């Protein structure tokens, strides 16, 4: 009897050279999982079929690098934002530019299409969020509230809300109809890179550079659970179509999570590096990553991945819509999104033949739109993907065939054949998570939850590092032994970059030391600030903090803005240095500042007093700005929490 061929659970599909220069952004079409759009430093947007090596279409018109791209749900429109702040919308079926939208003052960091209406949301480095009406070619509303770049935008499935994630460590929820913020979700300690709505329930997931994923209840506006211990910054998450689990694209692995309670269902090794986007089609998860000018695509067979804590359900068929949301046994039922009633499966297309129905564009916009082109590189692939939509109804949508899985390597096949289950069973240390058994094993009692790891106040162990990460890993059957060259390549990875960083820091410190030896402390601090490297500022402040007599009032005016940055840093040593410096300033200079501001004006001209009064006003303004940050962090637990509470008491006189 022939031995059945064992196929891989995850494999690399293809690698392409997507642009003539570096790739800066990419996105997968979520409806088909087969359409890929890439934006590059060559100012172009290129479209690809995920399983073909040739570019389908190249969209031109931007005059600066493309920073963000997004496809709408039916994959008929694409929007791209550039480094200059301009936004362009193309019609893929008509193969032409549809709109040029101007208004942001900095590069576009995030985009999203409204699921039903013809609206686009954009987030920028200028901290603003704008909602655009594609039909009228204008900004409908501007949402303000973030203090740093907006990295991700997502509309809710019912189209009533907009979630935003930013570098200021917060997630905000906006009501589109009321035009105001509904709630702010603090809790992350690093920039938030991605947010994703649950497909059915009032639940939101957010991933951050602090290596955590948080789940938020959108009825009670509070955190449901927090998954910690991700191997790196969280950049890409995706809910399963039936909402039973969340996929997280980690560094070289795919992790499957539940949230009530927080636990890890499965971990699959995928050598995709830093995955940029995920999509699901035909029970296969497609992941794409980019490096320099190359884009790589990977496939994970979800039929061999554990997605719930109970017996696996029948796979969701992509060629037919869900009749109703499948209940998640691991979570209580929440309120379900109410989709608006529609007469067709896609929004009404923009009419191009009636110029009077929309605002007349300026002559500059006309010129920009005339210069924008859609160059069809492969007519056969273009007609196959886009042209049939004009004459063939897309209800039900066209079904694509799953990608065939390649067989395992010979050595791996022999080992896999000896296993009772074809699924790859790899155990990873996942802190604070409960790893459930795979089906068909049914556990009568839940597995005990791991005790949370406590980071000691004294740094007798590396913060953020776990000894289990350095233990010998379980041998992976499908991976061959590393040859010497590959092993050395892995060891050297990042070495050149670190050398550049350390060399630059050494040069900057030499510059500051040269000024310091002249005895001018204020000029030394000014030069450190001008370098625009917080590590140099921290090194200098650690020296100044040791001798309180070095502090002067004019030094405070320079240091206080840097202290505000340090208090918001994700590095513990930076925060600690900022707190120490702020405490010294408050103890030595706050009484002087308050007395100077409260004193009546003097008679006659006193130049030195006027200069001192001006410095006191600057310090008071900066301290007021910092006081809000200190108050928000005074509720933290641990050593930093007590330090911030002490600072909050010292700053009470500012109120």
Swiss-Prot record:
Region (Interaction with KATNA1 and NDEL1): 433-655
WD repeat copies, ranges: 18-58, 61-100, 103-142, 145-184, 187-226, 229-269
Keyword Flavoprotein (UniProt): no
Region: Interaction with dynein, residue numbers: 1-284
A Pfam family the protein falls into: Katanin_con80
Localization (cell): Cytoplasm; Cytoplasm, Cytoskeleton, Microtubule organizing center, Centrosome; Cytoplasm, Cytoskeleton, Spindle pole; Cytoplasm, Cytoskeleton
GO biological process: cell division; cytoplasmic microtubule organization; microtubule depolymerization; microtubule severing; mitotic chromosome movement towards spindle pole; negative regulation of microtubule depolymerization; positive regulation of apoptotic process; positive regulation of microtubule depolymerization
Positions with biased composition (Polar residues): 340-351
Region Disordered, residue ranges: 311-422
GO cellular component, one term: cytosol
Chain spans, region Interaction with centrosomes: 1-300
Keywords: Cell cycle, Cell division, Cytoplasm, Cytoskeleton, Disease variant, Lissencephaly, Microtubule, Mitosis, Phosphoprotein, Repeat, WD repeat
Main location: cytoplasm
Phosphothreonine carried by residues: 395
Family: Belongs to the WD repeat KATNB1 family.
Biological role: Participates in a complex which severs microtubules in an ATP-dependent manner. May act to target the enzymatic subunit of this complex to sites of action such as the centrosome. Microtubule severing may promote rapid reorganization of cellular microtubule arrays and the release of microtubules from the centrosome following nucleation. Microtubule release from the mitotic spindle poles may allow depolymerization of the microtubule end proximal to the spindle pole, leading to poleward microtubule flux and poleward motion of chromosome.
Disease: Lissencephaly 6, with microcephaly: A form of lissencephaly, a disorder of cortical development characterized by agyria or pachygyria and disorganization of the clear neuronal lamination of normal six-layered cortex. LIS6 features include hypoplasia of the corpus callosum, severe microcephaly and developmental delay.
Name this polypeptide is given: Katanin p80 WD40 repeat-containing subunit B1
Name of the gene encoding the protein in the UniProt record: KATNB1
